From Swiss-Prot:
It comes from Photobacterium profundum (strain SS9). Monomer. This is Isoleucine--tRNA ligase. The keyword Zinc applies. Keywords: Aminoacyl-tRNA synthetase, ATP-binding, Cytoplasm, Ligase, Metal-binding, Nucleotide-binding, Protein biosynthesis, Zinc.
Amino acid sequence: MSDYKDTLNLPETGFPMRGNLAQREPVMLKRWDDEDLYGEIRKAKKGNKSFILHDGPPYANGDIHIGHALNKILKDIIIKSKTLSGFDAPYIPGWDCHGLPIELMVEKKWGKPGRKLTAAEFRQKCREYAAGQVEGQKESFIRLGVLGQWDKPYRTMDFATEANIIRSLGKVAENDHLLKGFKPVHWCTDCGSALAEAEVEYQDKVSPSIDVKFKAVDEAGVVAKFNCAEGHEGQGDVSVVIWTTTPWTMPANRAVAVRDDLEYVLVQVEADAANDKAAYRLIVAAELAKDVMDRAGIEHFHNLGFCKGADLELMRFNHPFYSFDVPIVLGDHVTTESGTGCVHTAPGHGQEDFVVGQKYGLEIANPVGSNGVYLPDTELFAGQHVFKANDVVVETLKEHGALLHHHAYEHSYPHCWRHKTPIIFRATPQWFISMDKAGLRAKALGEIKNVQWLPEWGQSRIEGMVEGRPEWCISRQRTWGVPIALFVHKETQELHPDTRVLIEKVAQLVEQKGIQAWWDLNPAELMGEADAANYEKVLDTLDVWFDSGVTHFSVVDSREEYNGHSADLYLEGSDQHRGWFQSSLVSSVAMKGKAPYNQVLTHGFVVDGQGRKMSKSVGNVVAPKDVTNKLGADILRLWVASTDYTGEVAVSDEILKRSADAYRRIRNTARFFLANLNGFNPETDLVAPEEMVALDRWAVGRAMEAQEEIIKAYDGYNLHGVTQRLMQFCSVEMGSFYLDVIKDRQYTAKQGGHAQRSCQTALFYIVEALVRWMAPIMSFTADEIWNEMPASQGNGEQRDKFVFTGEWFEGLFGLADDEVMNDEFWAEIQQVRGAVNKLLELARKDKVIGGSLQAEITLHANETLAAKLNTLEDELRFVLLTSKAAVAITDSMPEGAQKTDVEGLFVTVNASEAAKCDRCWHHVADVGTIEGHEEVCGRCVTNISGEGEERKFA
């Protein structure tokens, strides 16, 4: 055999079998950076139709986690696929840089502003801290193979961006959507600031559940409303009963709300002589009366009379422990789902309470300070923290005989997303974007219908949120944030009449010096001494959701890279329906009257292999850095693309191992292609399609069909579909059939002969397509493959430096449907081959043959199938990987044959008695008959020193 080894076309390539991605990828990244890959893409696509995926900014604090990796890789895959589809698709990564988490990190080191540092110095420290965090995260994202304008990202703290955020506020005000009000807002006592809806998360909490009695001022007048039978009006005090889980809000109670159309009952609670308890009467919703009595442990009671809630309007009841009385008011928010049907109303501590309070002119009492402590003038509770005061309030109610019942109650309660601590509703002076003042809610709901939501359920989700959302509280009482750069009248608090002009002047200052320019500004510099005497600066800062929400203007509309185009796609986690998607929508409609995006695509959260949330305490956290250091970024990227990311996305060591296995299959397929292109020059060696061996044309046709499906999947953001089709192509169509069949021809045919060159032509065309399909997902590996491919593209042109600057390969072709050996023909041949393989395997197990090339088989088939098999002539044996394959026509199973899965096909398997060729390993009768070449067959002699064998079909 050694004498003939040099006559074989052995595969050879510099593309290694093992990826060693963790070591190789950083080297490739350096090359991408040194040779300005991103800039090369921009040059190549300049002037093409644009596709803009606008990056939702991650927060500049902490290391990136696996959810960040999922998000950034998804974006990168989509952008690279759009680039290959010919779009100019720039990617400008961004960061959210203001806000409390950064303040807290700076406070840990330097203390609160005003102590060791002035406010200005504190802001500078925040800026420096955020910049450092951006750099750390940036390196992590780059390591994932994400291409973008990393040298010039957008940061919400960039002076130009801060200026544009202020301009955005001006536009909102100009369009009459800005509102100043004293309203209850979500308030975190740890932050000392208002929270937006998106900053609130719900967790289970145990609260004191209390039923409280409010005693009627005019008992006879109240009882008269219930139409009791004469002489059966009952006896004892008359009280309306409320239920609440926030006893601390009782000092702010200013009414009891009932529903106008609900039926209410006057209940007589009978005297309990054994416990020295007098009789008394209670008012509750009729539907809930039994529940209330059961809860309070009242066994002896009966109903005295009924009335509608509307009949009780404005009847007055004594506050449980203060010396004033409160009215009964009507509210649509009152239900009979729980409680008593009579709702404790504190307009300073609840949105619905506030609305009812406005309607009835109730006092908006807020006895609680920003730190959650009752103000000094709060009777009975001054100086106590509200949550600690719950027990004190309960005791006070007991002392006043107003507590009907008390027990611990577990329920879902709003918490601060940063501190994970319970929050309160607290009325404070705040700035709002009004949802209804100028029709913003209705316009936003209309615009939602003009957007494509992927998955479709995203539309109903965000519609429900916009329909039900309160006014957007955009003001914060913080130090590190973009200022609400407005001037208000010192007495009336009205906006300055020249607000539009003043906003632009402030924005220009901030553009030069950053947000500190606002705090350093003397109002007289902008408006003159006379106006400055009457107007003052607003010292609140903007909600960071406003910062990121207006990037459709501050970034997309402003960066020259986008050429004035608006965003085609926003892509974030599904939690952003209540976050960035909504803040972007509301601000864009408020500013421009239209949605900021054409499509919104969401992905789910990452969970572990058992579906559990990632948690350090559980020990199931998968860090992107650990994966790239161990397996490489391409494995992580393939994992992302292989998942159905629209739902929860599972990751674990085992799941990543499966991705690594899939990666190896794809890599080995690519390596086979490259290794067998050894010695192939596309400029001189390409075979014309019509002259190619039929099976080679079939293989190129399979690639053409795969490419159509893959591009369609990429266009639909169906990355799971891309990887499935890619795996099917590599493992099934190529690995299990085509590549298996062509090894004999590729290795043993005459070097440079038609049989070999036809095969290499197919391999060349297929790998040209394959490397592009891979590029968006396995970017590093695609780049590696690209650099091992022939320098020429076969059209007189040299290959681009990078696969990412080109477009999908357009040189594929397939078999025509009217050809005898069309796709349907080869599909049937594969079925026959599969059936034969099963029988060969049995023959191997039974030791009839050693390997398939030792087999001589006869295929007994019906006339139709036999005719198809015979079209392959002597080349049928190459398809079946046997040394001999004969076809016989039969309608019944011959003696000694075996039935197969293919209808009408029976097969006889025998061991060949012919000698084995040392070169091709086929068992052929003429081995040993050719002088000078006694060890090989005649076919091999022809391929070594003759014209070379002729192959037409396989």
